[in-house]
């Protein structure tokens, strides 16, 4: 397991960061077999697209290989959200989320020198390919489909607000650290929902390493500590949140939680 103190995301690629983060969260994360499988898939992809000369045709063939031949795609039926986020599991089942599928596809495409970048759109991760003629493709990592402006506007209105509008900066390339945070935030929520509190705590500690003073991450860590009955440290974190975000409506709920923990401590003593 990687020590949190040794991780420096600024020196790692997006894919390396996700592997290192997964090792830090899960002792049994099989990074060697994940890297070996991806190396083999990159070799296969290189051969599959080699008959094409133009980058856009190469990317078209890679999309066909990934989503049709290899059959990667979104999960359906009954499943645990965390199972669709762990990269080792996604490689095994070929079912993932926009962010996990996007990270795998992006790693393969970039290894093949294709001009693809991540975009943390307000509703989900999308992939952006920029071509020499200034045209761009926006790709849905769930299924490999090319997205048009109308679809993106519908997503915004359906998920954010009926009055939401699509702005150019919604489609700007995102920094790796933004994608990592998106992935870790989703994973943390999934693990908390699944009551895997020790793993959720590891995720939260990683997020706090990225932004040590984020009161919302500190609040979540406090809530996880409370679930684990580590009441002393839970109180410290929850009080920090209330002091730093007094105007947040959630603060009133957190104050009740603080009072409940303090009552428990009084009874125990």
UniProtKB/Swiss-Prot annotation:
Source organism superkingdom: Bacteria
Pfam families associated with the record: TPR_9, Transglut_core2
InterPro entries documented for this protein: SirB1_N, TPR-like_helical_dom_sf
NCBIfam families registered for this protein in UniProt: PRK10941.1
Entry similarity comment: Belongs to the UPF0162 family.
Protein name: UPF0162 protein BU173
Species of origin: Buchnera aphidicola subsp. Acyrthosiphon pisum (strain APS) (Acyrthosiphon pisum symbiotic bacterium)
Phylogenetic placement of the source organism: Bacteria, Pseudomonadati, Pseudomonadota, Gammaproteobacteria, Enterobacterales
């Amino acid at each position: 397991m990687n020590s949190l103190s040794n991780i420096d995301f600024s020196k790692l690629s997006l894919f390396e960061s996700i592997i290192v983060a997964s090792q830090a969260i899960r002792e049994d994360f099989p990074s060697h077999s994940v890297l070996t499988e991806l190396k083999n898939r990159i070799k296969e992809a290189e051969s599959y697209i080699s008959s094409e000369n133009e980058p856009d045709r190469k990317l078209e063939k890679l999309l066909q290989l990934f989503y049709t031949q290899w059959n990667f795609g979104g999960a359906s039926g009954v499943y645990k959200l965390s199972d669709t986020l762990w990269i080792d599991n996604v490689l095994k089942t070929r079912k993932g989320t926009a962010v996990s599928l996007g990270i795998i596809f992006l790693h393969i495409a970039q290894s093949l020198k294709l001009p693809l970048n991540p975009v943390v759109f307000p509703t989900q991760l999308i992939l952006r390919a920029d071509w020499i003629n200034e045209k761009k493709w926006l790709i849905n990592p769930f299924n490999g489909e090319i997205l048009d402006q109308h679809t993106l506007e519908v997503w915004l209105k359906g998920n954010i607000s009926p009055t939401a509008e699509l702005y150019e900066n919604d489609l700007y390339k995102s920094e790796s650290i933004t994608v990592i945070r998106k992935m870790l935030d989703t994973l943390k929520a999934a693990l908390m929902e699944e009551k895997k509190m020790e793993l959720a705590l590891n995720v939260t500690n990683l997020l706090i390493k990225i932004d040590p003073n984020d009161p919302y991450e500190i609040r979540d860590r406090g809530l996880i500590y409370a679930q684990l009955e580590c009441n002393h440290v839970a109180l410290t974190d929850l009080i920090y949140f209330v002091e730093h975000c007094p105007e947040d409506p959630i603060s009133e709920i957190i104050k009740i939680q603080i009072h409940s923990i303090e009552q428990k401590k009084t009874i125990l003593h």
